[in-house]
């Protein structure tokens, strides 16, 4: 994959000729090298201008938040405690609001024997803030599991100082509606004031009480609430819930409310027939989008940074399968509007730093940043057109590239995790049409599985077009 600027140009009829709306995704740390399945980017907000990168296999690295950084330090390795089978792994990382003084941070991960989701606290070394103490683990809460998917796993502190934890329904849909079960919920706990023999307390303002009910629950009715975030200026909690058959959801979370699964998927009954929602206190999603090749929302953040004025106040999120990164605009009153920004396959997570700048973790191993500006585009110099057909295809598909000027061309196929699986062209190429067939095989000649892939056209070190294709065998 190119480690340079990735560009998607979105035409604007309001701009003069030669000017286009451009959204740039670029490698935030081009001299650093790649990570292995980065699952999170977190700023400890301790005044040190550092970022912590969590890898799914259980390692956390610390780096300087500087585009010129060339090295990383291993902060913590708990890979021996973790299973990465199916959707398992190190899933969440959060720093205590008073981390600068107490050095506490929290992780969530999937473990076996017995199978469970674990929320645990660790401490950084007081004499070396770039190294954690592996022996400092304090298990806060463990959630029994039957399956290894629909885990959720995001943890984050709210402005109220409480810790929130999103949990999927473990592939057992009915658990999401059962308040005596943890699964399919957003929890809210007090880690500063333990009580009741636990390593945490329950805030007095939590909404649920009663025999057998888990008082830790803040909201419920989720399928797989993989990522959520807080928007401090508004106090809203934004949550992306991964759908089943038809719809991906963006929800605004309210105290004690039911978000519908499995009675509803998106704004429709599930399955699509009549359903009785009487007395269920259901809140419909703020926004939904149909699958049509999309299949797994990655919830993001409302952008509040200084670098992209055109994105301020917009909710930035992605679809893991299509790679589409989008901006949702909502003023709290009118229906939301959505705009595609760019494409980057295999995005599991977003992060923000102390300035509100947005980072994008990709399973290609890179950490990206996003820029959206009005930029003069010299289209005749490197303009290219990418055509693919048939799409979907069975045994082979035809790929054509048209260049209006000579360019260094890298035309490659990527899977949904962002891994390059086939190189179709990689050469200095003359102006004109260049054509190639792809037979659905990787670079070693093995036939790939049916599914969604991406053909990416790089010219002169810039990604100028990415097209989704579907192989059906």
Spans of model-derived segments:
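Acidic, Gly/Ser/Thr-rich repeat motifs that build Ca2+-stabilized beta-propeller blades
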Residues: 21-174, 227-230, 235-243, 293-331, ...
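Short, glycine-anchored, charge-dense loop/turn motifs used at functional sites
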Residues: 161, 414-421, 453
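Beta-propeller domain segments
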Residues: 54, 88-90, 98, 169-337, ...
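Bacterial N-terminal signal peptides
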Residues: 6-16
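Beta-propeller fold detector
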Residues: 28-30, 70-79, 130-142, 198-207, ...
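Glycine-centered coil/turn sites that cap beta-strands in beta-rich domains
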Residues: 378-414, 423-427, 435-438, 458-459, ...
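C-terminal tail/sorting-segment detector
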Residues: 428-431, 435-437, 443-473
